[in-house]
Amino acid sequence: MACPKKKTSNAKRDQRRAHWRKQAAREAQKALSLGKSVLSGRSNSFVYPTKEEEEGEDEE
């Protein structure tokens, strides 16, 4: 016969939420760092279109 599940404790719930929030904060920090790198012009790890290239494509 089926028996009801035990309730998850508040400590376990808080521990899981803290882990999730820590991961989200880490990813947000990475995204912010990458954005700053792109805006400062120091990034050379990937290619993205610049305004000069976009204007040149329209004339062709």
Curated annotation (Swiss-Prot):
UniProt feature coiled coil, ranges: none
Pfam (any one): Ribosomal_L32p
MF terms in GO: structural constituent of ribosome
Superkingdom as given in the UniProt entry: Bacteria
Keywords: Ribonucleoprotein, Ribosomal protein
Biological process terms in GO annotation: translation
Residues covered by region (Disordered): 1-60
Any one GO cellular component localisation term in the record: large ribosomal subunit
Basic residues bias: start-end ranges: 1-23
Sequence similarity: Belongs to the bacterial ribosomal protein bL32 family.
Name of the featured protein: Large ribosomal subunit protein bL32
Organism: Microcystis aeruginosa (strain NIES-843 / IAM M-2473)
Gene transcribed to yield this protein: rpmF
